[in-house]
Amino acid sequence: MLRVPEPRPGEAKAEGAAPPTPSKPLTSFLIQDILRDGAQRQGGRTSSQRQRDPEPEPEPEPEGGRSRAGAQNDQLSTGPRAAPEEAETLAETEPERHLGSYLLDSENTSGALPRLPQTPKQPQKRSRAAFSHTQVIELERKFSHQKYLSAPERAHLAKNLKLTETQVKIWFQNRRYKTKRKQLSSELGDLEKHSSLPALKEEAFSRASLVSVYNSYPYYPYLYCVGSWSPAFW
């Protein structure tokens, strides 16, 4: 009789532990699943390619080459950012440059142009205060009783007439000056009226002065004696 070989204990365990063979996965024909499967496959290929082909280590460059490369990288990195900053600085400095050139041109041309004669400034005339009829009557009435006002009286009068103290003070000063001038003119008129001396013209006055001088020093013709001579007529 044929003997069936008995399985060994290790082999039996291995055969018993082997998982069942998985069935073939079902493929979906939806567009989303097809695109997703293609992207996953492409990503898996690239990752496996990277793992197989490691990137070569960069060779050490000399200091000069490194500085040049760094400068080029800085220029490339700061190029688009520096462009608007340079445009802003140019826009800010452009008016200042034009202003400086304009000032220089004006200084150069100012010496060539003839200077116009400067007209002397006329002194500004002080505006006169316009008094109303009622204010003038009250001021005249106060002036007829009192020619000079104290500070409290002037303030009280200015408050009643709705004027400033300076206006009241100036009005009284002008009124006193006008009164004195009238008095002087009237006194001179009285002197001319009551004067007894006749009014002489300039020629008459000169003739009268000569006659008075001649009469004050009379002249008597006679001969003086010379030696033993005696006057002939006396």
From Swiss-Prot:
Superkingdom of origin: Eukaryota
Modifications after synthesis and translation: Ubiquitinated by TOPORS; monoubiquitinated at several residues and also polyubiquitinated on single residues.
Keywords: DNA-binding, Homeobox, Nucleus, Repressor, Transcription, Transcription regulation, Tumor suppressor, Ubl conjugation
GO cellular component entries: chromatin; cytosol; nucleoplasm; nucleus; site of DNA damage
UniProt xrefs under InterPro entries: HD, HD_metazoa, Homeobox_CS, Homeobox_NK-like, Homeodomain-like_sf
A GO molecular function held by the record: RNA polymerase II cis-regulatory region sequence-specific DNA binding
DNA-binding region: 124-183
GO BP terms in the entry: androgen receptor signaling pathway; branching involved in prostate gland morphogenesis; branching morphogenesis of an epithelial tube; cell differentiation; cellular response to hypoxia; cellular response to interleukin-1; cellular response to steroid hormone stimulus; cellular response to tumor necrosis factor
Subcellular location: Nucleus
UniProt keyword Zinc, yes or no: no
Statement: the UniProt record of this protein carries the keyword Manganese: no
Matching CDD domains: homeodomain
Low complexity composition bias: residue spans: 40-49
Region (Disordered) residue spans: 1-131
Composition bias, Basic and acidic residues: 1-14
Induction record: By androgens and, in the LNCaP cell line, by estrogens. Androgenic control may be lost in prostate cancer cells during tumor progression from an androgen-dependent to an androgen-independent phase.
One Pfam family, short name: Homeodomain
Family: Belongs to the NK-3 homeobox family.
Known function: Transcription factor, which binds preferentially the consensus sequence 5'-TAAGT[AG]-3' and can behave as a transcriptional repressor. Plays an important role in normal prostate development, regulating proliferation of glandular epithelium and in the formation of ducts in prostate. Acts as a tumor suppressor controlling prostate carcinogenesis, as shown by the ability to inhibit proliferation and invasion activities of PC-3 prostate cancer cells.
Protein name (record): Homeobox protein Nkx-3.1
Organism, as annotated: Homo sapiens
Gene this chain is encoded by: NKX3-1
